Amino acid sequence: MLASASRERPGYTAGVAAPDLLDPKSAAQNSKPRLSFSAKPTVLASRVESDSAINVMKWKTVSTIFLVVVLYLIIGATVFKALEQPQEISQRTTIVIQKQNFIAQHACVNSTELDELIQQIVTAINAGIIPLGNNSNQVSHWDLGSSFFFAGTVITTIGFGNISPRTEGGKIFCIIYALLGIPLFGFLLAGVGDQLGTIFGKGIAKVEDTFIKWNVSQTKIRIISTIIFILFGCVLFVALPAVIFKHIEGWSALDAIYFVVITLTTIGFGDYVAGGSDIEYLDFYKPVVWFWILVGLAYFAAVLSMIGDWLRVISKKTKEEVGEFRAHAAEWTANVTAEFKETRRRLSVEIYDKFQRATSVKRKLSAELAGNHNQELTPCRRTLSVNHLTSEREVLPPLLKAESIYLNGLTPHCAAEDIAVIENMK
């Protein structure tokens, strides 16, 4: 069966192991699909499987990431609660005591009137009006410069929240304006990010050329150039603007850095907003701040894109290593299977040949003994005849040892006397 199976397989050659699927010479003679002709083997897969493996994240991975994010949120909530809740309780207690002291000192004002005044103040603050001083100290939040800055926060999706449309017409226009402006700003941000990436890329290339002259490894060069790129961007778009805001807005260094990071990451809490106080040249100051936001966002987008490229490269290398391992495992399995099949085929052929030889010897012995049954048989020949007749339905196992043939039922002494008979019949 094995021999027939080997003849049915096209291109099968007895005694030859499976062709090396990674060897170009042997692969050139084999028309069947192979792993690869390159030095780095890859695993064959259909286009659908490869696309799904590349573009679709597995549910197990999604679930793991989801659990990590939830755990991260729980940790953040715990830390923020521990840091901020005592301050909130202190502020609530302080305002209650101040209200009681104010009512005690001003008997003409009752608690209801005071609450109404406080509610109006809260409403004014929510509308972007700070009820301090007189009208001469008030700054409009809807002049041309402030409106330009607000429109910029809409399309950049920062949304500080210090001011917002209060009229129905303003809300409707803001919806339409955001839906059209956000994609437009996305194209602009991508273009500016590409230009910044090109500029920084040229600078990084010069730095790498300098380090190459010093015989530094490529990995160290890449790490050093990346660190220089990030540090230069942080100085240009974070540290320097923070110093400017600290000087112009009168904030502390921590508040200035806090505003810069919260703004450029498009979080935009709105607790700190540039241009919120009475500043000279305010109409020009806010548009300049918006252009800084544009370039800073482009820089952060370039950094995030670079990090994404790193992750893709790492993922690609990991997949290549796994694919190479699988290819070698498949090659090893194929070779072992081929060798096992070849060994089994050879054993089958040898056993079959020996069986045929034993059958032929048995037939010749039967014919010889049948022709000489009237002759006088020696005790050894009589033993051979009896054993042959009783074992006619069994296979006569040939035993080859020291180039001498011993038949079942013969002692070495008898075999020595009749060995010539067997040799003549072979």
UniProtKB/Swiss-Prot annotation:
Q: Where is this region: Selectivity filter 2?
A: 266-271
Annotated spans, Selectivity filter 1: 157-162
- Sugar-bearing residue positions: N110, N134
Which sites bind K(+) 4?
T157, T266
Q: Tell me a GO cellular component.
A: endoplasmic reticulum
Sequence positions that bind K(+) 1:
T157, I158, T266, I267
Site annotated as pH sensor: where? H141
Chemical reaction(s) catalysed: K(+)(in) = K(+)(out); L-glutamate(out) = L-glutamate(in); chloride(in) = chloride(out); Rb(+)(in) = Rb(+)(out)
Where does the chain bind K(+) 2? Answer: I158, G159, I267, G268
How its function is modulated: the record gives: Activated by various stimuli including intracellular acidic pH, mechanical stretch and polyunsaturated fatty acids such as arachidonic acid.
Any one Pfam family here would be Ion_trans_2
Q: Where are the transmembrane segments?
A: 62-82, 172-192, 223-243, 288-308
Q: Which InterPro entries match?
A: 2pore_dom_K_chnl, 2pore_dom_K_chnl_TREK, K_chnl_dom
Superkingdom of source: Eukaryota
Q: Which GO terms describe its biological process?
A: cardiac ventricle development; cellular response to arachidonate; cellular response to hypoxia; chemical synaptic transmission, postsynaptic; chloride transmembrane transport; cochlea development; detection of mechanical stimulus involved in sensory perception of touch; G protein-coupled receptor signaling pathway
Instruction: From the UniProt entry, list the residue stretches annotated as the region Interaction with AKAP5.
Output: 313-326
- Outline the segment boundaries, as ranges, of region: Important for GNG4 binding and L-glutamate release in astrocytes: 17-38, 51-61
Q: Please report the record's description of how this protein sits within the membrane.
A: Multi-pass membrane protein
As stated in the Swiss-Prot or TrEMBL entry, residues carrying the post-translational modification Phosphoserine are S348
Q: Which family does it belong to?
A: Belongs to the two pore domain potassium channel (TC 1.A.1.8) family.
Domain remarks in the Swiss-Prot or TrEMBL record: The pore-forming domains 1 and 2 assemble to form a single pore in which M2 and M4 transmembrane helices line the central cavity and M1 and M3 face the lipid bilayer. The transmembrane helices are bridged by the selectivity filters 1 and 2 carrying a signature sequence TxTTxGYGD that coordinate the permeant ions. Up to four ions can simultaneously occupy the selectivity filter and at least two elementary charges must translocate across the filter to convert it into the open conformation.
**What is known about its subunit structure?**
Homodimer; disulfide-linked. Forms heterodimers with other 2-pore domain K(+) channel subunits, such as KCNK1, KCNK4, KCNK10 and KCNK18. Interacts with AKAP5; the channel is recruited to postsynaptic microdomains by AKAP5 where it can integrate neurotransmitter receptor signals. Part of a complex composed of AKAP5 and ADRB2. Upon AKAP5 binding, the channel is no longer sensitive to intracellular acidification, membrane stretch or arachidonic acid stimuli. Interacts with POPDC1; the interaction enhances KCNK2 surface expression and is inhibited by cAMP.
What is the protein name given in its UniProt record?
Potassium channel subfamily K member 2
Question: What's the source species for this entry?
Answer: Rattus norvegicus
